[in-house]
A protein has these predicted regions:
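Transmembrane helices and adjacent periplasmic/lumenal helix-loop junctions
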Residues: 227-244, 370-377
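Interfacial aromatic-anchored transmembrane helix boundaries in multi-pass membrane proteins
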Residues: 243, 269, 417-419
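Primarily membrane-embedded glycan-assembly and transfer machineries that use lipid-linked glycans
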Residues: 4-222, 247-376, 382, 386, ...
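Aromatic-enriched
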Residues: 22, 26-53, 387-457, 463
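Short alpha-helical segments used as structural interaction elements across diverse proteins
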Residues: 231, 322, 373-374, 420, ...
Length: 463
C-alpha cells in the first residue's frame, strides 16, 4: 500500500509540473490570447471560479496523497482529516456550479469609492476597515477581486471546520463526535452555502470569533485582537464582548480596547474620518426603509409588513421593533445568567466556564438585533444550536430543537410571508430551550454515550 501511494504521489507531482509548464509556455509564446485557445468557458459558468475550483480540488488530491505517503494520517486523526477533505471537496464542486456571486460587488463599489475619494455607497453597511483594505486590489478589476475573495472564503471554510471541531472539543465533545457533527452540519447548511455563494464576510467574522474564544487566557492579546477584527468586519459581534467581560479578565479587556482603537485608526490614517460618518449615515438610512424584504428576517422587516394593512406609521413601527429587541436582549441576559448559574454547557471545573456558559445565548442577540438579518446571517447561530445537542434529552425537546434546526439551516431560502420568517423564529426557540434545560437536573447522557461510542470505535490505517 505504501509503495502504491508513493507512486501515485510521484505521478501527481509530474502531472502538476506538466500542467504548470504548459501554462507558462503557452502564455510566454502567445500571451492571454494563447491561453484562450486552450481554455473554454462553458455556458452558465464563471471561468475564474471554474479554474480556481479545479486547481484547488487538484491540490486537495495532492495533499491527501502527501499525508498518506508521509504517515500523517493515523487512527487518532483519520476522522478529522477525512472530515476536512469531505467538506472542502463538497463545496469546491458545489460552488463551481454557481455562475453569479453577489455581495463582493458591494465591497468592490465601496473600495472603489474610497480609492476615488468618494463617500461610501449606501449599500455598504459595515465599518470602513474592510473597504479600506480591499481598495488595494481594486485595480485587479471585478474578476480579480472575485478570485481573491473566493479563495479567502475557501480558506475560511477550512478554518471554520477546524475551529468548529476544536470549539466542540472545548465544550466536552470527543474529537470523533465533534467531527461527525461538524461534517453533517456543514454538508447541508443554507446559511453557510449562501455565505459562500455571496462571497460574504460572515464566514471570516465567525472564524475570528471562534479563534478568539479558543485563545482566551492562552494569549489575551491575540484573543482580543481577533474579536476586535470581527467587530470591525461585522459590528454585531460587539454583543459577544459581554461574555468576555464577565470573566473579569482586565488584561484581556485592556487589549481589546487598545486593539479596537488601533484598528479603527487604519481607515482614519488612509481615508480620514469621513468613512465612519458615511457608515453612520448608511445605518440611519436602514431605519427609514418603509417596505419589507422577505429575505430579510429581522424584527424590522417583519413589523414593517403590517404598516399598510394596519395603518401604522413608520415611527410607531420603529418603537415596536426597538421594544421587541429590548425584550429579546433582556430575555437573553436572563437565560445567560441561568446558564452560568446552572453550568448548562460546561461544569464549574472547566477553565473559563463563565465565558463558555455565557456566550451561546449572546450569539442569538448578536444575530436578531441587527437591523437586517439575511439568510446567511444564520451562520452566527452555529454554536447556539450545536452546543444544545448534549443538553436536551426528552422527545418533546428534540422535536422543538429539530424544528428550529430545520427552519434555520436546512430549509432553502424562499420568499413567502410569514413562512419565510422561520429564521426569525428558530433562534427564539433555541433561546427558550436554553432556558428550559436549566430547569432539568438530568446529566448530559447523550454527550457521554456518544463520546464513549465514537472513542471505542476502532479501525486500522493500512500501511
Amino acid at each position: 500500500m505504501k509503495r502504491a501511494l508513493q507512486t501515485s504521489f510521484i505521478i501527481w507531482t509530474i502531472l502538476s509540473a506538466l500542467v504548470l509548464a504548459s501554462v507558462i509556455v503557452i502564455y510566454l509564446r502567445n500571451g492571454e490570447t494563447g491561453l484562450n485557445l486552450f481554455i473554454q468557458q462553458w455556458p452558465l459558468s464563471n471561468l475564474t471560479v471554474t479554474l480556481e475550483a479545479t486547481a484547488y480540488t487538484w491540490l486537495c488530491a495532492g495533499a491527501i496523497l502527501y499525508l498518506l505517503v508521509n504517515d500523517k494520517v493515523n487512527a487518532e486523526n483519520a476522522f478529522f482529516v477525512a472530515g476536512f477533505f469531505i467538506v472542502i471537496l463538497l463545496y469546491l464542486n458545489v460552488l463551481r456550479e454557481r455562475f453569479r456571486y453577489g455581495d463582493y460587488q458591494y465591497y468592490l463599489e465601496a473600495a472603489t469609492a474610497l480609492m476615488n475619494n468618494q463617500p461610501l455607497p449606501d449599500t455598504y453597511l459595515y465599518l470602513p476597515l474592510w473597504a479600506t483594505l480591499l481598495q488595494f486590489i481594486v485595480p485587479l478589476g471585478d474578476q480579480g477581486m472575485l478570485a481573491i475573495l473566493w479563495t479567502v472564503n475557501i480558506i475560511m471554510l477550512g478554518s471554520f471546520y477546524i475551529l468548529l471541531v476544536r470549539v466542540l472539543e472545548h465544550y466536552g465533545y470527543s474529537n470523533r463526535f465533534a467531527v461527525i457533527i461538524a461534517v453533517l452540519f456543514m454538508s447541508i447548511n443554507t446559511p453557510l452555502h449562501r455565505s459562500l455563494g455571496y462571497v460574504q464576510v460572515n464566514l471570516i467574522a465567525m472564524v475570528l470569533i471562534m479563534a478568539s474564544l479558543l485563545t482566551f487566557r492562552k494569549n489575551d492579546l491575540v484573543s482580543a485582537l481577533l474579536l476586535a477584527l470581527a467587530v470591525h468586519l461585522k459590528t454585531s459581534p460587539a454583543a459577544l464582548a459581554l461574555a468576555f467581560l464577565l470573566e473579569r479578565n482586565w488584561k484581556w479587556l485592556a487589549w481589546f480596547a487598545l486593539t479596537f482603537i488601533l484598528i479603527a485608526l487604519i481607515p482614519v490614517a488612509l481615508e480620514g474620518t469621513r468613512p465612519y460618518f458615511d457608515y453612520l449615515t448608511n445605518i440611519n438610512i436602514l431605519t427609514h426603509i418603509t417596505d419589507t424584504n422577505f429575505h430579510d428576517t429581522s424584527f424590522d422587516s417583519f413589523f414593517r409588513f403590517f404598516n399598510p394593512f394596519l395603518g401604522i406609521n413608520l415611527e410607531a413601527t420603529r418603537l415596536i421593533t426597538m421594544g421587541a429587541k429590548a425584550l429579546l436582549g433582556l430575555a437573553a441576559i436572563y437565560v445567560m445568567a441561568q446558564n452560568i448559574r446552572s453550568h448548562t454547557f460546561v461544569s464549574r471545573e472547566t477553565q473559563n466556564h463563565i465565558l463558555l456558559n455565557a456566550i451561546p445565548s449572546l450569539f442569538i442577540v448578536m444575530t436578531l438585533t441587527s437591523p437586517i438579518v439575511w439568510d446567511h446571517h444564520g451562520i452566527f447561530t452555529t454554536l447556539a444550536f450545536l452546543l444544545l445537542l448534549h443538553c436536551i434529552e426528552t422527545p418533546a425537546l428534540w422535536m422543538w430543537f429539530g424544528f428550529a434546526y430545520f427552519l434555520e439551516f436546512i430549509l432553502p431560502s424562499f420568499d413567502f410571508f410569514p413562512w419565510s420568517f422561520g429564521r426569525l423564529i428558530a433562534p427564539l426557540i433555541v433561546l427558550c430551550l436554553m432556558w428550559y434545560v436549566t430547569r432539568s437536573k438530568q446529566s448530559p447522557s447523550l454527550l457521554v454515550s456518544a463520546n464513549r461510542w465514537f472513542e471505542n470505535l476502532k479501525f486500522q490505517i493500512s500501511q
